């Protein structure tokens, strides 16, 4: 992992946690966000609208963005085709962020790419879905959030959110 370049598409809390873990192993991280150009927990920041032009610079692309009308299909055929040789795409956010048909077609054409997918447009992934047949795809059943210490982190976030809500109501 040391020395690789990682694009994290979605620079919110989840994206920052992903970046922190990659940075711990010596990776260089770039956060892509639609709202800001400020570095927050990343080595670099970029606007999401520039993703297609610079996605070819990254060894790994991790999708952590929220699904909004403006982000639906964000990872398009053009973005996928622009990924560098032997790149890895990871989606732990929402299936609708990736154009599912385009992803299947590109992964069928480009055996050098690899996708690790925890989420899909329609879940669970049906037994006849063609993604199951691709050797360059790993599928998990929407459980990437399961990890040691996750409950503690979730309760800390809930506590902080409740505290903020109460303080704003005073």
Predicted regions and their residues:
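Glycine-rich NAD(P)-binding loop of Rossmann-like domains
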Residues: 1-17
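Residues at the starts of beta-strands that form the adenosine-phosphate
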Residues: 5, 27-28
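Short, structured coil segments at secondary-structure junctions
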Residues: 25, 41, 133-135
């Amino acid at each position: 992992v040391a020395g690789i370049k990682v694009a994290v598409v979605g620079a919110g809390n989840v994206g920052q946690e992903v970046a922190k873990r990659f940075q711990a192993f010596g990776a260089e991280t770039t956060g892509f966000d639609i709202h800001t150009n400020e570095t927050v927990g990343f080595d670099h920041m970029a606007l999401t609208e520039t993703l297609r032009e610079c996605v070819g610079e990254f060894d790994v692309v991790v999708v952590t963005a929220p699904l909004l009308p403006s982000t639906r299909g964000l990872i398009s055929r053009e973005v996928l085709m622009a990924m560098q040789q032997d790149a890895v795409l990871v989606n732990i956010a929402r299936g609708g962020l990736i154009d599912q048909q385009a992803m299947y077609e590109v992964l069928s054409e480009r055996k050098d790419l690899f996708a690790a997918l925890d989420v899909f447009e329609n879940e669970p992934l049906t037994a006849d879905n063609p993604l199951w047949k691709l050797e360059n795809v790993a599928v998990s059943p929407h459980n990437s959030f399961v990890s040691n210490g996750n409950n503690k982190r979730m309760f800390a976030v809930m506590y902080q959110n409740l505290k903020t809500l109460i303080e704003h109501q005073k």
